[in-house]
Amino acid sequence: MAAKKSSTPNRGFKVADQIQRDLTELIRELKDPRIGMVTLQAVEVTPDYAHAKVFFSVLVGDADATQDALNQAAGFLRNGLFKRLHIHTVPTLHFMFDRTTERASDMNALIARAVASRSKDDDEA
């Protein structure tokens, strides 16, 4: 027997996008001093909507302390999502620090170093 197809294609992406928008507002309302300037980069929701990985970056502050604070506030944030979202199951939130910006910065530095080295070699030849 064929697997049942979802009635709405890309519903998971739409739910993840709505969770990201609502969480952004809810996090702004938190009073925890460990949570500074947080930017939500992405939300990945499991197909059964039981869990959501929330990837964030921090402009100022300690990423580990922010991650701990967000994971401690996950129940409060989930409750806030429950009041805003109109879905049967609101996922359990798992906050993870997104190192993409750090990796991009490292790659840019490596590229700049390689270009500088190449131009130095060309000048010597």
From Swiss-Prot:
GO biological process: maturation of SSU-rRNA
GO cellular component annotations of the record: cytosol
UniProt xrefs under InterPro entries: KH_dom-like_a/b (IPR015946), RbfA (IPR000238), RbfA_dom_sf (IPR023799)
Domain of life: Bacteria
Sequence intervals crossing the membrane: none
Keyword Cell wall biogenesis/degradation attached: no
Compartments where found: Cytoplasm
A GO term for molecular function: ribosomal small subunit binding
One Pfam entry name: RBFA
Keywords linked to the UniProt accession: Cytoplasm, Ribosome biogenesis
Family of this protein: Belongs to the RbfA family.
PANTHER family the UniProt entry points to: RIBOSOME-BINDING FACTOR A, CHLOROPLASTIC-RELATED
Quaternary data: Monomer. Binds 30S ribosomal subunits, but not 50S ribosomal subunits or 70S ribosomes.
Function: One of several proteins that assist in the late maturation steps of the functional core of the 30S ribosomal subunit. Associates with free 30S ribosomal subunits (but not with 30S subunits that are part of 70S ribosomes or polysomes). Required for efficient processing of 16S rRNA. May interact with the 5'-terminal helix region of 16S rRNA.
Protein name: Ribosome-binding factor A
UniProt source species: Paracidovorax citrulli (strain AAC00-1)
Lineage: Bacteria, Pseudomonadati, Pseudomonadota, Betaproteobacteria, Burkholderiales
